[in-house]
DNA sequence: CGGACCGTTCGAATAGCGGGAACAGGCTTT
DNA sequence: AAAGCCTGTTCCCGCTATTCGAACGGTCCG
């Protein structure tokens, strides 16, 4: 498990995914457009596009290529096979019904938080998150709950790798401040997010840990700042959340 | 738009996706396992795996590699950007609430049907379909509804490409029989599925067409055969469905 | 009618992919 | 303990397959 050994990547594969990324970002792109963006010969891009299209990974509409629904198949497969999904999903639905707010299940992967499932109550606001979204762990409640319950060396490594970019002016960007913050989260067992990712939005997040105590994901409740405050925010929601994550942890251990 | 011109695929990219496919199918695989399966040298697989892992597309857990949630990000992106999704989604939810059965939104891509969104009523059975699932168009109600409303040359081409494989003993496998069947669907505007994809499951599907009358997708209602029969199946559900698809078509035209 | 742009095809040169052999480490077996 | 066998990993070399640029054949626009 060598960490950062000098490994030479397969460049052809990289360009293939570069093309996919450009097509994704542009929400459909043409051959010359892609070639210009990536500074490749048109013929090269053409051959790649045709290869990906033959595999069904890109779809050609006229002269523009789009990403195909094969990625949806792959993605849903990943989600369904994840240990947390089956167990956490019903709990997330339950919490959404009880709190009438937006509830998310987030997992950690490669040092970032990934939203794998969300449910909303009747009166919940539409958050800006969506399924599959990747967010730096220090920027939101669920992420901080996860980060606080990782081994120290992993925490430091993640901070080294991604830094502490700000999402709003409330986002924690100072490393020492974050370390203290994480210590507090570790002590009480859950995390708050007060407009640190979206202005006007508060959230509470609690970690889901495995047998050895390491976080593998988290569940969070998010809602408008003027509704999530006072005892509801500091007492009631944490209680609900901890009850849910505790149950999830038990179910995880017996599956 | 040359159809089947002699184009040489980029083989390196193909092997990369072969590896991804093996990892997906095996639900996590090790280097030697993949190498054996694809008859490649261990060193080759290793280099590819490390490349994909560096890009975040594979995740390494110990010595086994898994597909990462990046595919979820790509996949959800594809779905959200699809014209039909935003428009059809609320209608699908509505139909599920009204009928108390499983309702699916299916789109056509590359000649196959892709389930992009599903909603279920309280009493609906769990169908065997899942988001992202790809099904041959002749095998189910939504697919037949789409197939019937494609240009003739596309229909023939799709049948040529994929054949008429059976899912149950009721699946239509005779080409002439299917042609007649499609003609009937075209006349009345919607399709039935009586245990043609899953034994014990019936369904009704209606196409969503664009301005020129070509189907771009379909919506279907599915449920147990003993519940979906008689006038409910032949009158009420088709009415509901046509009302919904009609509305979707109008909304599509004005977006 | 002509120019400018597109996607597409072709051939040729070389960069980089793939393979095999050797290494290091962990686990089981003797 | 130690020998054996299985990993994943690294290295380097040869040959193939990728890349590029130029030329072709469309189509759209002026």
What name fits each language-model region?
Chain A
Residues 70-99, 116-118, 123-128:
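Conserved segment of winged-helix/HTH DNA-binding domains
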Residues 127-197:
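Short, solvent-exposed recognition segments
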Residues 105-110, 118-119:
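Short hydrophobic alpha-helical segments used for membrane anchoring or interfacial signaling
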Residues 206-211:
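Sensor-regulatory modules in signal-transduction proteins
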Residues 1-85, 246, 250, 254:
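N-terminal helix-turn-helix
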Residues 92-100, 104-107, 249:
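Short regulatory alpha-helical segment in sensory/regulatory domains of signaling proteins that mediates
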Residues 218-255:
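Juxtadomain coupling helices with adjacent low-complexity linkers
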Residues 215:
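Glycine-rich acetyl-CoA-binding "A-motif" of GNAT/NAT acetyltransferases
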């Amino acid at each position: 498990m060598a960490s950062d050994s000098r490994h030479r990547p397969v460049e052809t594969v990289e360009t293939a995914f570069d093309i996919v990324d450009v097509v994704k970002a542009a929400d459909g792109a043409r051959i010359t457009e892609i070639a210009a963006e990536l500074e490749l010969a048109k013929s090269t891009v053409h051959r790649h596009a045709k290869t990906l299209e033959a595999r069904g990974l890109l779809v050609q509409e006229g002269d523009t290529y789009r990403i195909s629904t094969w990625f949806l198949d792959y993605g849903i497969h990943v989600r369904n096979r994840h240990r947390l999904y089956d167990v956490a999903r019903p709990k997330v639905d339950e919490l959404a019904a009880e709190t009438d707010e937006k509830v998310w299940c987030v997992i950690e992967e490669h040092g970032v938080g990934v939203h794998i499932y969300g449910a909303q109550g009747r009166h919940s606001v539409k958050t800006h998150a969506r399924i599959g979204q990747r967010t730096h762990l220090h920027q939101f409640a669920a992420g901080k709950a996860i980060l606080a319950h990782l081994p120290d060396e992993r925490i430091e490594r993640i901070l080294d790798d991604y830094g502490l970019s700000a999402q709003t002016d409330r986002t924690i960007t100072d490393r020492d401040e974050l370390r203290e913050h994480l210590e507090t989260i570790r002590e009480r067992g859950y995390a708050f997010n007060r407009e640190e990712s979206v202005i006007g939005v508060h959230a509470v997040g609690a970690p889901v840990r495995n047998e050895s105590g390491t976080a593998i994901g988290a569940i969070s409740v998010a809602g408008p700042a003027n509704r999530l405050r006072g005892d509801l925010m500091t007492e009631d929601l944490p209680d609900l959340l901890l009850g849910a994550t505790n149950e999830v942890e038990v179910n995880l251990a017996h599956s």
